[in-house]
């Protein structure tokens, strides 16, 4: 019977947006980063918010390469630094957190019943790239991020919009930081410094939610 129910459920449409939501929440961690511009005396001249976008790192590298081809190309590409980009780079099953697959629990308020099978644990891998023209700008951004991950930062989210009582904790771990400055031109012609921060997030993917309220006993008379 459990096996039969599994095959039936494979034909049931559902979309819980777990990966999409995780990507959005991850990006929101870094959407309020600023750098300060100061004079030689340390007086703040301006504060610049660092733009953040979801995009593959390689697309920014291509645009930075175009910028190095002269002022006309730089105006055409129109990319301003510093800035950041992030992307999801992996979705991997995590067997160490797997609970019995056929377990179900009631995910509905009192008086209703919606059965939800145990979630399947996955590790989502992300990378965040920081692009800057100066080392000081790049380090201002990096040092506003790293201290919050020691090496883990936990996010609390509601995985189902129609089931607000369910809350999931998503541990986000900083796994490494890489530095790249491979431009072979003069110091003045350097196109960009790039820091790449790598993260993992532990979450669960869920199947369809079965509404089984019809079989509930609403009232018992003695």
Describe each PLM feature range.
Residues 9-102:
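Small/polar-rich, solvent-exposed N-terminal microdomains that initiate assembly or binding
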Residues 1-8:
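Short, Lys/Arg-enriched N-terminal segments with co-localized hydrophobic residues
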Residues 70-76, 110-118, 182-189:
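Catalytic micro-motifs at enzyme active sites that drive phosphoryl/nucleotidyl and oxygen chemistry
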Residues 118-120, 140, 149-209, 214-216:
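Acidic-leaning, charged glycine-interspersed low-complexity segments
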Residues 10-13, 17, 91-92, 113-123, ...:
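Extracellular/virion structural assembly segments
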Residues 99-113:
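Conserved alpha/beta core surface patches that mediate binding of polyanionic ligands
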Residues 82-90, 118-134, 143-145, 191-204:
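Oligomerization/assembly interface segments of phage tail-like spikes and tubes
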Residues 108-111, 215-222:
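Short, cationic low-complexity segments
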């Amino acid at each position: 019977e459990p096996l039969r129910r599994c095959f039936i459920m494979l034909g049931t449409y559902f979309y819980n947006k777990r990966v999409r939501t995780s990507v959005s929440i991850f990006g929101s961690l870094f959407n309020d980063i600023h750098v300060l511009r100061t004079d030689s005396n340390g007086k703040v001249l301006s504060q610049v918010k660092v733009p953040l976008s979801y995009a593959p790192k390689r697309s920014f590298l291509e645009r930075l390469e175009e910028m190095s081809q002269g002022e006309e190309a730089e105006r055409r590409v129109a990319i301003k630094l510093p800035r950041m980009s992030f992307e999801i780079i992996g979705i991997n099953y995590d067997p160490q957190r797997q609970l019995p697959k056929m377990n179900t629990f009631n995910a509905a308020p009192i008086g209703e019943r919606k059965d939800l099978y145990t979630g399947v644990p996955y590790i989502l891998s992300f990378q965040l790239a920081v692009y800057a023209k100066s080392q000081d700008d790049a380090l201002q951004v990096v040092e506003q991020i790293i201290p919050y991950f020691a090496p883990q930062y936990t996010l609390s989210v509601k995985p189902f919009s129609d089931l607000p009582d369910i809350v999931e904790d998503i541990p986000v771990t900083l796994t490494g930081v890489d530095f790249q400055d491979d431009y072979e031109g003069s110091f003045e012609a350097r196109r960009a410094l790039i820091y790449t921060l790598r993260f993992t997030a532990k979450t669960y993917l869920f199947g369809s939610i079965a509404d089984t309220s019809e079989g509930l006993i609403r009232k018992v008379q003695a």
